[in-house]
Amino acid sequence: MTGVAAPGAGPRPGSAVARRGGVLPLDKPAGITSFDAIRQVRRILGERRVGHAGTLDPTATGLLPICVGRSTRFVDYFHAQPKTYHCVVRLGERSDTGDTEGVIVAGADASSVRADQVRAELARFKGEIEQIPPMHSAVRHEGRHLYELARAGEEVARKPRRVTIYSAELVDFRPGAPAEAEMVVVSGKGAYMRVLAADLGDALGTGGLLAWLSRTSYGSLGLAASITLDQLEAMDDPWLALLPPEVAVAHLPLVNLGPAQVLQVRRGQSVWLPRSVLPNIAGECRMHDPTGELLGIGELNGGLLRPTKVLAG
């Protein structure tokens, strides 16, 4: 029967199902790039179709969702989901990269900065704000990554981008010269914690850099459900570490389809759904077959469901 259900990720798949693709909630260690992590996952799984959903800098740790197999079609859906970061901002120092990887220089004396001042300035960064992408980033300029230009000693003008900071809370403050502000930040797509650290330091008049960062959640995924590369390597069947592809799209409304409708969708045909079983929604939704397995993504408009991404059966 056709109907609508609440979002959910579903159970962890068995090995046979997992080998068709899924999401690996990797706990990335410090000292490797996100692409280094991808290379290791490809080697361990013996699968070429592997892609991550949002870069973590080499010094950063934490949750790096990796889409495997047919789930790589859903990487972009992760980007729209909020991310939570636990980070430490060092006040009284600056860096050309915005973190500890770059050339660190002294800022202004931060010994007089108080926790209430940090909270007050941090509150100004909540909501929609503008950030200028750092030179050491994957943003492209005339076909080249900014980090490539930075490594060549070039600096180019970058346009500010609008990003969203849903919340930013100071959880600890360690006064001194330099001082350290420990924070938990929930952000939307495209927000740079390095830029937030530098901008916060500028607002306080001391300068600032990102001293430490860990991503603790990404959409419906939490760090508690993640797995390290060493743990993955030690598994008899590492494919069992994969979560269902639905994890990437669990934030979308769910439409359950009957057998005849599934056949239409698999042929790429649109399906009319009875208004009596649909909520007042429009836009993207995820589709389930009668067994509860993810069929793909569709666009719902006035009762007409148009399939846009359909997983192979």
Predicted regions mapped to residue ranges:
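Accessory RNA 3′-end/elbow-binding domains used by RNA modification enzymes
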Residues: 1-25, 29-52, 56, 60, ...
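Residue-level signal for inorganic ion chemistry
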Residues: 66, 87, 143, 196, ...
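Short, structured loop/turn "capping" segments at alpha-beta junctions
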Residues: 128-133, 177, 194, 206-212
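Acidic, low-complexity central loop/insert segments
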Residues: 77-131
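The conserved catalytic core of RNA pseudouridine synthases
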Residues: 43-47, 65, 155-195, 199-205
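Glycine/acidic-rich beta-strand-loop module
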Residues: 45, 49-79, 148
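Structural signature of FAD isoalloxazine-binding scaffolds in flavoprotein oxidoreductases
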Residues: 76-91, 156-170
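Extended alpha-helical targeting/anchoring segments
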Residues: 137, 141-165
